[in-house]
Curated annotation (Swiss-Prot):
The keyword rRNA-binding appears for this protein: yes
N-terminal signal peptide: none
Function summary: This is one of the proteins that bind and probably mediate the attachment of the 5S RNA into the large ribosomal subunit, where it forms part of the central protuberance.
Transmembrane residue ranges: none
InterPro entries: Ribosomal_uL18_bac-type, Ribosomal_uL18_bac/euk
UniProt family annotation: Belongs to the universal ribosomal protein uL18 family.
Pfam family, one: Ribosomal_L18p
Top-level taxon in the UniProt lineage: Bacteria
This protein's name: Large ribosomal subunit protein uL18
Keywords for the protein's UniProt record, in alphabetical order: Ribonucleoprotein, Ribosomal protein, RNA-binding, rRNA-binding
Gene designation: rplR
Length: 118
């Protein structure tokens, strides 16, 4: 990709991100689960927007998981366990401007399958 195409791709993602964040708000009972995917790894965190603090997080890089759908499902299982330890059963899913496809969708489905209501 040339520089102009990369700039446009990032600008479109930033616009989607702002549009989504204006509608989502997490609190202590129903935190916002924000995901980030790089070219190699996948990260997620549960955020209480009222207190502006992170409740729990998961880092695929430290656990040796790559940015694949299979690894996203495994991370979803582990993250669901972390959320249940914190006493959280319902969350607001913030896809962070990414399209709901591939690893972003696989992670969300894995959370649902493990008892977290999105």
């Amino acid at each position: 990709m040339n520089a102009k195409a990369l700039y446009k791709k990032k600008a479109l993602r930033d616009r989607r991100k702002l549009r989504i964040k204006s509608k989502l708000l997490g609190d202590a009972l129903r935190p916002r689960v924000s995901v980030f995917r790089s070219n190699r790894y996948f990260y997620a965190q549960a955020i209480d927007d009222v207190k502006q603090s992170t409740i729990t997080h998961i880092d695929g890089r430290k656990m040796g998981f790559k940015n694949t759908q299979e690894d996203a499902k495994k991370l979803g299982v582990l993250f669901a366990e972390e959320l249940k330890k914190a006493g959280i059963e319902r969350v607001v899913y913030d896809r962070n401007g990414y399209l709901y496809h591939g690893v972003v969708a696989a992670f969300a489905e894995s959370l649902r399958e493990n008892g977290i209501a999105l």
